[in-house]
């Protein structure tokens, strides 16, 4: 039964698409809290984020240092009040800055200070990703593993990142669509990059990626 559901969910990708429909959604104001944090701070923020309501989401990227984004969408007075109660906790991290935007399109991602884009036309890259549930009490172990992975990264173009998918993905919505729903909170990924045509560096980088993921 599960296999059949998965096939039905994948059907649009196997078919010839002749028509599509677009539906717009209401654009709401967004508060963004962002900045560099250390690993201990990341651990605390991840623990808090697993209690976030569905209108708040944490994303982070670990390149040379850890940079986080927290997005909070403001929809109604009651939701806004609850949202601010969660965000008050973040006042204890002085390096984080707050910005307010009228809509999502105004937001700029990944500041130049991250120095991510040593990546260029002369680089090739590979990404590996997977969905995962709440870490809960395993957050300290996750942070320890993350630090070990980054200690071994082969060059400055490689990084690890994760996106919090949102509250609704924690719920099993069996039968709500033809897609197979999984209880998921986090979408971590590893980005690996190497110089074009440098097979030796490619092997080192890919070995790092596979070892990190295993």
Where are these regions (language model features)?
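Soluble FAD-dependent oxygen oxidases
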Residues: 1-214
């Amino acid at each position: 039964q599960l296999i059949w559901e998965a096939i039905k969910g994948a059907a649009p990708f196997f078919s010839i698409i002749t028509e599509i429909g677009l539906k717009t959604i209401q654009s709401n104001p967004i508060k963004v809290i962002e900045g560099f944090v250390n690993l201990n701070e990341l651990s605390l923020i991840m623990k808090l984020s697993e209690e976030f309501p569905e209108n708040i989401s944490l994303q982070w990227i670990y390149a040379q240092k850890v940079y986080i984004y927290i997005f909070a969408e403001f929809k109604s007075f009651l939701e806004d009040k609850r949202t601010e109660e969660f965000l008050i906790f973040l006042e204890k991290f002085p390096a984080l800055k707050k910005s307010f935007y009228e809509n999502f399109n105004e937001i700029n991602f990944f500041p130049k200070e991250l120095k991510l884009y040593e990546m260029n036309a002369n680089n090739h890259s590979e990404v590996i990703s997977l969905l995962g549930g709440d870490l809960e009490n395993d957050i300290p172990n996750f942070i320890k593993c993350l630090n070990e992975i980054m200690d071994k990264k082969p060059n400055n173009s490689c990084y690890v990142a994760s996106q919090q998918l949102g509250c609704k993905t924690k719920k099993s919505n069996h039968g709500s669509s033809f897609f197979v729903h999984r209880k998921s909170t986090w979408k971590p990924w590893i980005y690996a990059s190497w110089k074009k045509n440098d097979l030796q560096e490619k092997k080192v980088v890919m070995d790092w990626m596979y070892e990190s993921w295993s």
